[in-house]
Amino acid sequence: MEKNLYEQDYYLWLEKTIYLLENHQFSDLDLENLIDEIKSMSISQQKALKSNLIVILWHLLKYLQEPEKQTRSWALTLFEQRERIEEDLENSLSLKSFLTEDNLKKCYNKARQKAAIETGINLEKFPKDCPFTLAEALDFAFIPNQNQSI
């Protein structure tokens, strides 16, 4: 398969690649670009999981810092992000290996920055260490105790 096709007409490249795979014409495949696409899909799955977790942690921090300002949209956002993670894990069990304490810390640091920017509250007022466990973050019923000290 011409490597130029990938750059010239991506959709046609996809269609041709599918055809070649379905017809076991492996020697005609553009393996270099096919491998890159598969790697990219893997990275995309991890990025989506990370993004959803950041949004969850960000909103949980808002519940802690500004409980009086909570809205239904916060609860809806938490539900939607948790639902996305749940669906991703149901479809790809191996993604669960991405949900580590180390990645929780990384996501928390980004969520902390976002919460500070959105609320206008000094970053130092938010806990340096994540006050939530991974289980709490993913638990559909979990909303931080509004009396919880931070």
Predicted feature residues:
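Surface/interface-facing alpha-helical segments and adjacent flexible terminal/loop regions used
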Residues: 1-54, 58-150
